[in-house]
Amino acid sequence: MTTHQFEHPLNEKTRIYLRVEALLNQMERASTFSDGIQHQLFFRSLFDMLEIFEQIQLKSELAKDMEKQRLTYRSWLHVEGVDQEMLNSLLTEVDEVHRDLMSAERFGQSLKEDRFLSAIRQRFNLPGGSCCFDLPALHYWLHLPLDRKMRDAQQWMQTVTPLSNALKLWLKLTRETGHYRSRMASNGFYQSDAEDANILRLAIPLEYGVYPMISGHKNRFAIKFIDFHSGQACTQDIAFDLAVCC
C-alpha cells in the first residue's frame, strides 16, 4: 500500500525547527549547481534562514532543548533492560553536539558579514530580481567555474554546521519517541490527547485521495481530512497510521 507522509508541529518552536531543517536540506540538495536554476533555490533558502535567525534566538532555544534531552537520557543510566553501551554512545554524541553548539558564533553572523551575500540579498527577493542588470555580482559569480561555486557553497554551509548537527540530532531523537499506530478517522475526523508532544507524524494511504488539516497544541490535537479533488471535508472513514512524538 502506497502512503504519503505528513508531519505537523504542535508548538511554535518545533514549527521553526522543521522550517530550518527544510531550508538546510534544500541548500544541501541545491549546492551542486548541476543546472542553471539551482542557485535560485540555494540562495533563497539561505536568505530565508537568515530571516529566521534575525527573528528568534534559535541557538539558545536549541541548546536548552538539547540539554533537556541529555538529562532525560542520563536518567536511564543503570536502568535494568536499557542497553547501556548504546545509551553511553548516544550521550557522548549529545554532549559533543551540545558543546559545539554552545561554542559556535551567533547563527548567521558570518553569513551576514559576507560581502558577496550582502550585495545580493536585498534584491534577490524582488520579482524577477535575479536578472543580470539587478544583480551583476551574482551574474559574475554564476560564470565562475563549478568547483569554485561549490566550494563557496560549502564554506557558507559550514558556518551553520553546529546548528545543522544539533537540529538533526534533536529532531531524530524526538521522532524516535513516536511509534506508528493504526487509527481510524470517523467521517474524516480524528481527535486525541497528547501529553507534551512536539510532532505528529501521519502515514496516509494515497488511495483515499485526501490530505490532513491539523490543529492543536502539545496536549491535544484534531485532524480533519480534506478531499484533494473537491477541496471539501472528507466524510468517509479514513484508516491511517499516527505517531505522536515527544
From Swiss-Prot:
Which keywords annotate this record? Cell cycle, Cell division, Cytoplasm, Septation
The subcellular location is: Cytoplasm
Against InterPro entries, the record matches this protein to: ZapD, ZapD_C, ZapD_sf
Would I find Transmembrane among this entry's keywords? no
State a single Pfam family of this protein: ZapD
Its BP terms in the Gene Ontology are:
division septum assembly; FtsZ-dependent cytokinesis
Please indicate which superkingdom the organism of origin belongs to. Answer: Bacteria
Membrane-crossing residue ranges in chain numbering? none
An example Gene Ontology CC term for this record: cytoplasm
Q: Which SUPFAM superfamilies match?
A: YacF-like
What is the first-listed, main subcellular location in coarse terms?
cytoplasm
For whether the record's keyword set contains ATP-binding, the answer is no
Function field: Cell division factor that enhances FtsZ-ring assembly. Directly interacts with FtsZ and promotes bundling of FtsZ protofilaments, with a reduction in FtsZ GTPase activity.
Q: How does it assemble?
A: Interacts with FtsZ.
Family assignment from sequence similarity = Belongs to the ZapD family.
Q: What is this protein called?
A: Cell division protein ZapD
Q: Which organism is it from?
A: Vibrio cholerae serotype O1 (strain ATCC 39315 / El Tor Inaba N16961)
